[in-house]
Structure formats: C-alpha cells, structure tokens
Amino acid sequence: AEMDAQRARLEKERAHYEKVLGQIRDLGDEVRAEEIQQKIVEIEVGIADVEYRQANQRAGYVYVISNLGAFGERVVKIGLTRRLDPMDRVRELGDASVPFMFDVHALFFSEDAVDVEAELHRRFADRRVNRINNRREFFYATPAEVREELVKIQGDLLEFVEVPEAEQFRASQAIIDS
C-alpha cells in the first residue's frame, strides 16, 4: 500500500511537471525547460525504483540496531524493512515504548534482504531474547559480533558503527552521576 501510494504521488508529480514543461517550452524558455526536464527524469527514476521494489519483494533494507539505555550493551535487533525511507522503521521502533531512541549500527540495501536477515537470525538463534515469539527479533549479541557474521554473509559493509552513540542515554547518565 505504501509503495502504491508513493507511485501514485510520483506519477501525479510527473504529470504536473510535464504540463509545466509544455507551457515553458511554449514561452521559449529553454534554460528553465531543461531544469524541469531534469526534475522529470529524477521522478522517473523514483517511479522505476518503486516498480523494481514492487516486483522484487525479497529486496529491502537490513538493519542492526541497539538501545543501550533500554536493553544494555549486549542486545541488538536484527530486522528488515521494505519502506522507502528505512529510517522511518527505526524511528517507529524508538517511539514512546522505549526510553531512548535506537542507535543504527548497520542499515543497507540488499537484493535479497529476506535471506540476509534469515541467515543472521539463524546464526544467532541460540541467543534469541524471546524464544516463544520469533517475530521479536532481539538477540543477546554485541554489534561487533553481528558485524563479524554479517561480513561472512554479505561481504564488505560500506558502513558499520560498533559503538552506539546513545546520546540521550549517556547525557541522562551524566546528569544522574553529577
């Protein structure tokens, strides 16, 4: 549903710019017409991305996050999202149900995010926090341990943050300790 809405929004935006492009060309403003044409190309790239993701349901973003203030140093969440902005999912998880926002250790696109996530879950199965409900994707592991397994599965990672920033937690602790 989110992707359908995104596609409809992009198509509406493209139609608007195509109409404007015609009007600008009628006025003979080729410089502005080129700018509008570039915007249309960017929108078409966005539409192609949505179409690709709709056709490839295994594609998505794998994330590794932690919440030092809520769960301590040795608990991570390993999940996947197909959201257009994967940080929306991370922000959603850090809503009012936990005292601090989650820190992102890894967040990357994969053509087969389903398999990458499943393999990570398999490798950490004996460290699953909730052994009754497997949809709860929390594991007793450090970010460094997850990184080690992720490199074996995925290869080189563009970015991985081992030490959580935990800005609000650390600031809160400093106030408590003072």
Regions found by a protein language model. Give the residues of each.
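Non-catalytic accessory segments flanking enzymatic or RNA/DNA-binding domains
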Residues: A1-S178
